[in-house]
Regions:
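A noncatalytic interaction/capping subdomain that flanks phosphate/NTP-handling catalytic cores
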Residues: 1-146
Length: 148
């Protein structure tokens, strides 16, 4: 398993890859935020990323479909309070299946498609998980598209 740690807005998160020895090529825009390691106290979110970490099942309580223009999210919640999110591109081709506990501090993700789709899926999964896990710390994630 390879681990990448990042520090954004003075808080950290860790990605653990079960099948990729060095996944930095999937996250070029995160390069300025890479740190060598984080303590558990510094980390607000941990995500395990692997080929068989998560599947998306429609058997859970449906929360909603969200069309965000270039991305589409299908969200459900299971009986344990965990969220399951299928992240797709604008053509509704799956890029990532994400499962998160209630506060998004622990996540698992499986990526789909070619390298471009995997970058898209992982980037969106990190953005969603970071936004929800950081909320309880008073951190607001603002997408670059709203600052123009």
């Amino acid at each position: 398993m390879s681990t990448l740690s990042f520090c954004v807005a003075d808080v950290g998160f860790t990605l653990n890859f079960t099948d990729i020895p060095d996944a930095r090529y999937l996250l070029p825009s995160y390069a300025p935020f890479f740190v060598k390691s984080l303590s558990n106290d510094e980390r607000i979110m941990n995500m395990i990323v692997g080929n068989d970490c998560e599947t998306y099942s429609s058997e859970n309580e449906f929360v909603g479909d969200f069309d965000c223009g270039d991305s589409f999210y299908t969200i459900s919640k299971d009986s344990n309070g965990e969220y399951k999110i299928l992240i797709s591109n604008s053509q509704r081709e799956p890029a990532c299946a994400l499962r998160a506990n209630a506060d998004f501090s622990k996540c698992k993700a499986t990526l789909f498609g070619d390298e471009s789709m995997q970058r898209f899926g992982l980037g969106n999964a990190i953005m969603v998980a970071f936004a929800f896990s950081a909320a309880k710390y008073g951190i607001l994630l603002m997408h670059a598209s709203v600052t123009e």
